[in-house]
Swiss-Prot record:
Known function: Component of the anaphase promoting complex/cyclosome (APC/C), a cell cycle-regulated E3 ubiquitin ligase that controls progression through mitosis and the G1 phase of the cell cycle. The APC/C complex acts by mediating ubiquitination and subsequent degradation of target proteins. Regulates global growth and development, including phyllotaxis and apical dominance. Required for pollen maturation. Promotes (pri) miRNA transcription of each MIR159 genes.
Gene this protein is translated from: APC13
Biased composition, class Basic and acidic residues, residue ranges: 53-63
Entry protein name: Anaphase-promoting complex subunit 13
Localization per record: Nucleus
Stored InterPro entries: Apc13
Swiss-Prot/TrEMBL keywords: Cell cycle, Cell division, Developmental protein, Mitosis, Nucleus, Ubl conjugation pathway
Quaternary assembly: Component of the anaphase promoting complex/cyclosome (APC/C) complex.
Length: 63
């Protein structure tokens, strides 16, 4: 439900739409984005590689 400025409530979606769900998609992730589930010791090389590709420009100097 959503409230209009006059205080009336309107239906945005119907009951069938509210019960509907999206299917779970099994999408393959690149190895860099895959979640590591094991507790083995690994080098920090993969983390550093991902950090090197991170965009850091916040454009704070522009107006």
């Amino acid at each position: 439900m959503a409230e209009v400025s006059l205080g009336m409530l309107i239906d945005i979606v119907d009951e069938e739409w509210m019960r509907d769900t999206l299917p779970d998609d099994d999408l393959p992730l690149p190895p860099v984005l895959a979640v590591k589930t094991d507790d083995t010791e690994e080098t920090n090389q993969e983390t550093q590689q991902a950090d090197a590709e991170t965009w850091r420009d916040l454009a704070l100097d522009t107006q």
